[in-house]
């Protein structure tokens, strides 16, 4: 079994060694991929193609998607669910959508099997779980013929969900500020045009969503012995346009900004838009 750690959102899942994990936009995808020798010996056929291809319908077809959402306002689960299920049902052309309470550990939420049009050969299940300010969206989809092989394993993967108190291996900069994975140091002026004293600034470029970055920093700041004096979330009713933390450790005071940017070129910034990081040392 393989343990997957989502460092930004702070959760773990355990999945079979023959499964594949991939990052798909702002979600994490888990798919089974039966090696050809096993498929031939057990079922007389070979697993071929890419399980992430929607047209793939092999023995090992099926996909589990997990996506995080930042819920700083602590909105109730019901409106979040209604939005989630409405978008998903509309996209898939579903007509019958019910829901049932769902609880996993100390995370609570809702789940439903979405009944797709008869001409569609897929089964679709979805659910959302809320824990503190984090909401995890789950989606399981597979051909009806793959149900016997796929659903038991997918259920075990979802049931393995954990929120560890601490995730080891987080890197820090020279001031001791934790850095999310995949972020590289850049010149401050490459992110902010009006930096007149670059020696007192640190800047890091990456592609994590601004919601995921807020989840990361609110968890890691106290672990790394920083005191959070102020937090301005994004999005919010203010016109700040980014997320900001005021941090102090002993005599060192910093301002950390998470600056969202438009990667797609659409001209819009959303709660899942990627963000760069800038740090001002007082």
PLM ranges: what are they?
Residues 1-38, 162-191:
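N-terminal "mature-domain start" segment
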Residues 24-125, 142-144, 195-199, 205-248, ...:
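Conserved polar/disulfide-associated segments of primarily extracytoplasmic proteins
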Residues 127-132:
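Short glycine/proline-enriched loop/turn "hinge" motifs that connect secondary-structure elements
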């Amino acid at each position: 079994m393989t343990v997957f750690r989502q460092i930004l959102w702070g959760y773990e899942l355990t999945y079979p060694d023959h499964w594949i994990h991939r990052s798909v936009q702002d979600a994490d995808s888990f798919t089974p991929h039966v090696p050809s020798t096993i498929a031939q010996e057990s079922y007389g056929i070979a697993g071929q193609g890419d399980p992430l291809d929607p047209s793939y319908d092999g023995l090992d077809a099926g996909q589990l998607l997990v996506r995080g959402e930042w819920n700083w306002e602590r909105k109730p689960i019901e409106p979040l669910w209604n939005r989630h299920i409405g978008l998903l049902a509309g996209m898939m052309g579903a007509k019958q959508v019910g829901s049932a309470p769902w609880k996993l550990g100390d995370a609570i939420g809702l789940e439903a099997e979405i009944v797709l049009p008869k001409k569609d050969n897929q089964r679709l299940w979805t659910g959302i779980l809320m824990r503190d300010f984090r909401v995890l969206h789950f989606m399981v989809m597979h051909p009806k013929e793959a149900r016997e092989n796929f659903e038991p394993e997918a259920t075990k993967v979802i049931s393995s969900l954990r929120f560890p108190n601490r995730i080891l291996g987080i890197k820090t900069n020279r001031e001791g500020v934790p850095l999310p994975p995949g972020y590289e140091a850049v010149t401050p002026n490459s992110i902010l045009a009006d930096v007149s004293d670059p020696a007192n600034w640190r800047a890091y470029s990456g592609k994590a969503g601004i919601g995921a970055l807020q989840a990361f920093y609110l968890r890691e700041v106290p672990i790394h012995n920083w005191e959070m004096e102020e937090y301005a979330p994004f999005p919010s009713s203010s016109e700040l346009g980014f997320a900001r933390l005021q941090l102090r450790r002993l005599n060192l005071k910093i301002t950390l900004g998470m600056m969202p940017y438009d990667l797609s070129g659409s001209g819009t910034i959303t709660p899942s838009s990627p963000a760069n990081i800038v740090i001002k040392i007082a």
